[in-house]
Swiss-Prot record:
UniProt organism field: Schizosaccharomyces pombe (strain 972 / ATCC 24843)
This protein's record includes keyword Membrane: no
GO cellular component: cytosol; cytosolic large ribosomal subunit
UniProt protein name: Large ribosomal subunit protein P1A
Superkingdom of origin: Eukaryota
Summary of subunit composition and partner proteins: Component of the large ribosomal subunit (LSU). Mature yeast ribosomes consist of a small (40S) and a large (60S) subunit. The 40S small subunit contains 1 molecule of ribosomal RNA (18S rRNA) and at least 33 different proteins. The large 60S subunit contains 3 rRNA molecules (25S, 5.8S and 5S rRNA) and at least 46 different proteins. The acidic ribosomal P-proteins form the stalk structure of the 60S subunit. They are organized as a pentameric complex in which uL10/P0 interacts with 2 heterodimers of P1 and P2 proteins.
Cellular location(s): Cytoplasm
Amino acid sequence: MSASELATSYSALILADEGIEITSDKLLSLTKAANVDVEPIWATIFAKALEGKDLKELLLNIGSGAGAAPVAGGAAAPAAADGEAPAEEKEEAKEEEESDEDMGFGLFD
């Protein structure tokens, strides 16, 4: 991450912490006050990406909200098929061995 991106990220966090709307002008003024040269495009990108979003809420829900749904949904399916899965794997392994022999590409045939 470049210094410009990092400075703009920190500026967005400062604005969110103060409850101020995140705009490109405010991001640029904060980075300018910190004596960091940031191209205006970075401020615009960050402002548009965070527009209408609650940054505090996003940060608080990173671990719990995004990861919880896939884990809960993915855990139920394998638990139901535990009894059948090993038998299927053994059958597939036997089929793979047989298919190698049938092709006749062995080095020592």
